[in-house]
Amino acid sequence: MFAEFGVLNYLTYLVGAVFIILVPGPNTFFVLKTGIAHGVKKGYLAAAGVFIGDAVLMFLAFAGVATLIKTTPVLFNVVRYLGAIYLLWLGGKMLYAVLTQRDGQSDASAEPASAILKRSLTLSLTNPKAILFYVSFFVQFIDVNAKTPGVAFFILALTLEVISFCYMSFLILSGSFVTRYVKTRKKLAKLGNSLIGLVFVGFAARLATLQS
């Protein structure tokens, strides 16, 4: 399938892409957390930031910028530490909100839509693991001798975005269901926010020790 456009082993790529999307990451937890805290509409807004960020990284990978980052330790470390600091800030902010929240106080602040979009976009763009993925994974399924390697790259990128959209939709709708359940269970909501905050801190620690 799509071999005429320079795509190699598309079905193998499709299966691999599904499993990769299903692996939890910072973007996954941010979208889930947003869906739980702010509802479906803002959950999709968070997902939109992820989609835009992924599209930018895929374009940079195709343009060769991602390879430059991968092979230049200084650039890789800059992206890596920026991402780790941002994840640590997000996790710390969530934990602080839980610790300072008073009983009976609502934990769902009216966070502006623009802030949610910026956060999810920043999470995507400061993830060097995604950069390494697009360089190392995509290249295995593109015939470099094809007349239209750009079309092949676009097909692979679009496939990944569609799979990601389906998975993010599941997370957002699940988060909306969870919201209705925990509205009257404040201790459970606090526990959930604490766990997600700790997950972000854990991702920050792992990202800080990532090697190119």
From Swiss-Prot:
UniProt membrane topology term? Multi-pass membrane protein
GO CC annotations on file: plasma membrane
List locations, semicolon-separated.
Answer: Cell inner membrane
Record keyword Calcium present: no
A Gene Ontology MF term for this entry? Answer: L-leucine transmembrane transporter activity
Write down the chemical reaction(s) this protein catalyses: L-leucine(in) + H(+)(out) = L-leucine(out) + H(+)(in)
Q: Which residues cross the membrane?
A: 5-25, 49-69, 81-101, 122-142, 153-173, 188-208
Q: Which InterPro entries match?
A: LeuE-type
Task: Output the superkingdom of the source species.
Answer: Bacteria
Keywords, A to Z, come to:
Amino-acid transport, Antiport, Cell inner membrane, Cell membrane, Membrane, Transmembrane, Transmembrane helix, Transport
GO process annotations (BP) = L-leucine transport
For whether the record's keyword set contains Transmembrane helix, the answer is: yes
Cited NCBIfam families: PRK10958.1
**Similarity section:** Belongs to the Rht family.
Q: What is this protein called?
A: Leucine efflux protein
Q: Which gene encodes it?
A: leuE
